[in-house]
């Protein structure tokens, strides 16, 4: 099995064993020393570098497939903070869509549709129980519960 082109930890991922997507993260030997923009696709035997995300981050929420993924938040170590950005991948490019109400990292996420038109991001750094829903209708986020 081929290794990834860019070694990293705290990365986002989507897809299946035979068709995956890996994006963002931090240097494997020193997480927190600089975030990575890189996106790579897996075809079951090798990794290929494709178009990068717009915002480099570590510990972001992610879900979807290798042709339709979504990523939420994450830490941006260049600015020593968390971001509130949400980006969607369409199989070719990443596009920033509706942002989270509060920037945070290391939360959980999931989607119920293969095209990521409905997804949630919950919890995260700062011991929050906040849950936000992303809906493709107008590409907006709404807070379901927050504290």
Where are each of the predicted segments found?
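Polar, enzyme-active/binding microenvironments
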Residues: 1-147
């Amino acid at each position: 099995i081929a290794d990834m082109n860019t070694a990293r930890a705290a990365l986002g991922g989507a897809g299946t064993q035979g068709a995956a997507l890996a994006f963002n993260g931090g240097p494997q030997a020193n997480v927190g020393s600089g975030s990575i923009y890189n996106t790579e696709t897996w075809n079951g035997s090798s990794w290929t570098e494709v178009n990068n995300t717009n915002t480099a981050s570590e510990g972001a929420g992610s879900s979807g497939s290798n042709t339709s993924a979504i990523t939420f938040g994450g830490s941006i170590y260049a600015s020593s903070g968390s971001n509130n950005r949400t980006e969607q991948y369409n199989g070719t490019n990443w596009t920033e869509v509706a942002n989270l109400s509060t920037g945070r990292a290391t939360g959980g996420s999931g989607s119920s549709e293969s095209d990521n038109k409905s997804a949630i991001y919950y919890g995260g750094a700062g011991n929050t129980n906040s849950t936000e829903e992303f809906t493709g209708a107008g590409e907006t986020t709404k807070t379901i519960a927050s504290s």
